[in-house]
Structure formats: C-alpha cells, structure tokens
Amino acid sequence: TDHLTHKLKHHPGQIEAAAIMEHILDGSSYVKEAKKLHEMDPLQKPKQDRYALRTSPQWLGPHIEVIRASTKSIEREINSVNDNPLIDVSRNKALHGGNFQGTPIGVSMDNTRLAIAAIGKLMFAQFSELVNDFYNNGLPSNLSGSRNPSLDYGFKGAEIAMASYCSELQFLANPVTNHVESAEQHNQDVNSLGLISSRKTAEAVDILKLMSTTYLVALCQAIDLRHLEENLKSTVKKTVSHVAKKTLTIGANGELHPSRFCEKDLLKVVDREHVFAYIDDPCSATYPLMQKVRQVLVEHALNNGESEKNGSTSIFQKIGAFEEELKAVLPKEVESARDGVESGNPSIPNRIKECRSYPLYKFVREELGTGLLTGEKVRSPGEDFDKVFTAMCEGKIIDPLLDCLSAWNGAPLPIC
C-alpha cells in the first residue's frame, strides 16, 4: 500500500487503517521476498492483489469511523442525565422530558453490528484465499501440513465453520431499531430497543471472536508452511545441483560434457515450481518437478545439434543417469529437511521473527502452546482454536497485539 493513495481519498478511517498496515508491513521479510519473486518471475503471481487484500483499508475505513462514532455516542449517553422527572432546584421545577428514550444506544449498536459483520466478511474473504491453492501462491490446499496431503483435510472443516460464522454474522447485521412496536396502550408508541440491539451486538462480537480465532490459527499455519517450504526448496536446489554436477559434468572418458550447462536451467525450474505441488512424492513422473527437469534436459539435447549423434557427447544419453541418481537421493534429503524443521533445527530460520507481527505469532505458538497442524498428529484443529478463543475472551491477546504497534508513532509512513 502507498500512503498517497489514501491521502487523496481524505477519509480518516481509511488513512488510519492503511497507516497501521504500512507500519506492520514495513521491513517485512515476506514483502521483500515477494518483490524478489516478482523480479524473477513477474507472471508467478498477479500484478494486483484481489480486493480482499488490495482494498482492505478502503473497506475497513468507514467501519472504523462508524465504531468510533458509536463509541462516542454511547459514552455521551451513559455520562448524561436521564429524567422523568428531572428536578431543577434553581427554578423549583420538575421536568418530564424524554431523555429516557435510549435511541442513541439502539442506533449505535445497530451501526456497530453492521460494522462487525463487514469486518467478518473481509476476514472470511481473506481466509478463503489463504486456504485455496489457486490463490495462496504455492501453499498446499486447505493448508494441509502432512507428508501425504491426501490423508489430511487440513483447514477444510475450519473453512466450512467460517462460512457458517459469516452467514450468522450477516444475519445479525440486520437492524433491530426498525422493529419497534407500540406498547402501553400507545403511550410508548416508539421505543429504542437498545437492550435488544445490544444483546445482538454481543452475540455478533462472540462470532467475530470465533472467526478471528480461526483466521489467526490459519495464519500461523501458513507462516509455518512457508518456513517449511523455504527449507524444502533449499534442499531440493542443493540436491539437484549436486546430482547435476555428479552426473552431467564429466563424460565417459573423463572429458567435460556438454550437459554440464544444464545445471543453471535445472535450478530455475526448482525456483519457479511451487514446492507443495510435488514434495509429497518429489520423484514421481506424474508430478511437475520431474516433468520439467526432464524437459530442460531434452531441450538442451535438441539444441546440442550434431553432437547428439556421438554417444560420448549426447545429452540424451545422460538423462537416465541423472534421473536415477536424483530418485535415489532426493526423497531422503527431503525427509531429512522436514525432520529438521519439525525438531526445531531448520537450516533456514523462520522469517516471521524479522516481522513486526511476530509478537502475535509468538503468543499463539509459544504462550498458548499451539503448533503446525498435520493429519499425522492426534491433536485436532479444534483444540488449538479453543486455546486461542479462550485467550481472546480473557483479553490476553491485547498485549501482544499492542506489542506489534509498539514502535508506531501514530502517523502514516512518509510519501517518498
């Protein structure tokens, strides 16, 4: 996001939302990596994010303003003077007005509930992108963390629950104050319905907490999967490079072989291919890694011209040896890398530690004792959701949330 975009729109809520996002994302190692990815392969991800991400300041801004206005209105109401009667001692009068009419409460709660529903809708839209492998830039479908994704439902159940939460939240967004009925023989022919609206808003808050809990656990899962992905990709690159040097560099008679020039293009394949598209069986002929690796070797062979007719300089003759060696080595190396991550000894540290949102991740993972969810473990996603939801209801999440903003001076980043 660029602050100029929001400055030109003038809305204070949008400017505030964008400024907080800018602060959190400033210096993020994930953002830096995304820029590198775009430079390396501009077509690997969309030039523009989808609306749930790209327009989130514009979406949240008006609702921030609504919640703030509702808060001010309720503060005025609870600090004001009720009546029926009001006794004005200075004038010796008993005033029978209508300050008991709690319309500020009813209207404020209706507006707040509408804002809560909109926040929940945005959360669900982002969650749906996160668990969908068509949109999440290489993460596994349903954020499945198992060695065999076919036996791991991942966050499929959580997405169904999120859809249910979101539907109920949208239903609760309907206003209460337009359902007023006359009472007390038409003496109370209009009423605020503030209590009903407040109760429904409390229900909406609880549902938003459930959605926030589910989304937060899913984000931590995605972070850990990115960490796993980075370690696995590094291992695959090293292994492919090692096998290429071993099998493609030297010919049968000890001379340098033309196939040695394939290594650079082989590593490009590893860089550009999503790890989780093949890692559960990296040497399978039906998965993209082996297919594209072979394609590179075949293309080099086709460009080898007349040299292909000579067995000692033929690249085609090297393909079998390369693939056999890779099949013998790669699965073991991949399993070793995965074991290293699971045991807490990864070759590459988790990038989240360099981000301003790390206090929230640390709270969920370390203080609450949650972890990477896989179908191989006996712990269900619901157990982790319960831990986070309980902590949220007890207000324990406020401190780590504020820690994420501890260095923020309350102003947007300068336009440069």
Curated annotation (Swiss-Prot):
Gene3D superfamilies named in the record: Fumarase/aspartase (Central domain), Phenylalanine ammonia-lyase 1, domain 3
PTM: Contains an active site 4-methylidene-imidazol-5-one (MIO), which is formed autocatalytically by cyclization and dehydration of residues Ala-Ser-Gly.
GO biological process, one term: L-phenylalanine catabolic process
Pathway: Phenylpropanoid metabolism; trans-cinnamate biosynthesis; trans-cinnamate from L-phenylalanine: step 1/1
Annotated localization: Cytoplasm
Coiled-coil positions: none
Name under which the protein is recorded: Phenylalanine ammonia-lyase
Native organism: Vitis vinifera (Grape)
Lineage: Eukaryota, Viridiplantae, Streptophyta, Embryophyta, Tracheophyta
Gene behind this protein: PAL
